[in-house]
């Protein structure tokens, strides 16, 4: 039986530690929530999508990105020293491993490139029915969401066990997502 992520209203640091422990116990490649996104109207009509290349214990994005390449413009992030996200276009070329993350090797487009996207597919450690997102703690995506504005559809990928029925704690700078995709459902946030 899987352990479910159950955040209490304590510190976000404690919630992240619990979420990472749950995630570490999940089988690698068990979760493919990205597959549900292919039928979402927001993805079907998109011309530019910002996404990320998932790591082993994250919900898998590889199949989705490989399916979408050539169909839409894909931007992948590059984490800068100040924790902002720069972006580069990805067309299927080999990625470069930097600081434990996979980054595109093409020309950097700048942090403002996020303003060109229709959809932002974001990672997270947990989420709730309000669209609150527990990230890794650097605020990278919160800043990217603010820079992008409210128009791009923001969707977070989670393992089923990482969706919380309890409201997550939020700081004033936290930005919410508009949907959460798990392997079994696409949860639209009202």
Protein language model regions, located:
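Short capping loops/turns at secondary-structure boundaries
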Residues: 110, 133-134
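Aromatic-residue hotspot detector
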Residues: 99, 127-128
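Surface-exposed, charge/polar-rich loops and edge strands
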Residues: 1-12, 21-25, 70-71, 105-106, ...
């Amino acid at each position: 039986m899987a352990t479910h992520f159950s955040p209490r209203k304590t510190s976000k640091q404690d919630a992240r530690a619990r979420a990472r422990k749950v995630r570490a116990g999940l089988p690698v490649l068990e979760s493919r929530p990205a597959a549900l996104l292919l039928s979402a109207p927001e993805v079907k009509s998109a011309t530019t999508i910002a996404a990320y290349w998932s790591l082993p214990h994250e919900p898998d994005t590889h199949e989705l990105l490989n399916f979408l390449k050539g169909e839409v413009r894909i931007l992948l992030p590059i984490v800068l020293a100040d924790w902002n996200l720069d972006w580069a276009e990805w067309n299927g070329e080999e990625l470069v491993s930097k600081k434990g993350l996979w980054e595109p090797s093409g020309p950097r487009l700048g942090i403002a490139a996020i303003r060109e996207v229709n959809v932002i597919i974001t990672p997270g450690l947990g989420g709730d029915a309000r669209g609150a997102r527990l990230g890794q703690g650097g605020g990278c995506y919160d800043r990217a969401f603010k820079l992008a504005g409210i128009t791009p559809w923001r969707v977070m990928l989670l393992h089923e066990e990482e969706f919380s029925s309890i409201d997550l704690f939020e700081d004033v700078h936290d930005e919410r997502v508009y949907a959460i995709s798990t392997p079994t459902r696409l949860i639209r946030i009202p």
